[in-house]
Amino acid sequence: MENSYSVSLDRRNLLKHAGAAGLSIAAGSFMAAGLAEAQFNPPLRGRFAPGGSYILGQPGYRIPDQVDLGGGFMQRLEFYDRNERPFVMSDYRGKVTLVQFWHTNCHGCQAEVPALDKLAGRLEGSKFELLPIALSMDSQADIDRFYQRKGIKHLEVMRDRTSFVFSALAPRHPRLDAQATPTTILVGPDGNALGAYVGVAGWDQPDGVALLNHYIARA
């Protein structure tokens, strides 16, 4: 649904907020599905079909735990649980992980977060993790109210307190050329990016579930 995208941070604000590194990490790390289909051979149908909004990870691109901001300064890509404990993506190695960047005022997130909650109830286990990460505009209380209103039962509460993780990792929409929410990134058990979708993907629908199960079966 093209009208479900919520453009969260424009290029100027990203540069001010995260520095040039925030725009460069994901650049070139994802590619159109048609270019990589033969290398990965996943079931790409419906919204995940070549030529659409689903983009595959470049072979060997591992989601980083930190980025180089220049001058020898490394910035950790940390997000936090409700107890303010920091996490990085390598903490989820060993599982297929579906990361969702979202916020409570995002139009598309109103439907996708509850759908992913139900999906987590169906698929989460020793080989699969669903990881929602809310952006900095939401407080803990905002997320709790959203979860209560939407009846969220299975998803953890994670926050990207400065939206730096989002700005560093989220790809730009292949046609709109902007970062937006919701964005989902599918990560393999080795930490490599398998693919990403900017917008409401429909991971809970048959085509999305088939793609997830393809990787879960190989984890």
Predicted regions and their residues:
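Conserved redox-active cysteine motifs that mediate thiol-disulfide chemistry
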Residues: F101-A115
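Structural microenvironment flanking redox-active thiols in thiol-disulfide oxidoreductases
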Residues: A111-I152, F164-P171
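A short beta-strand-turn-helix
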Residues: L77-V96
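Alpha/beta-hydrolase fold active-site loops
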Residues: V96-T97, P182
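Thiol/disulfide oxidoreductase modules built on the thioredoxin-like
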Residues: I152, T162-L211
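N-terminal secretory signal peptides
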Residues: M1-N13, A20-S29, A36-E37
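N-proximal helix/coil linker or "cap" segments that precede and/or mark the start of modular domains
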Residues: Q39-R76
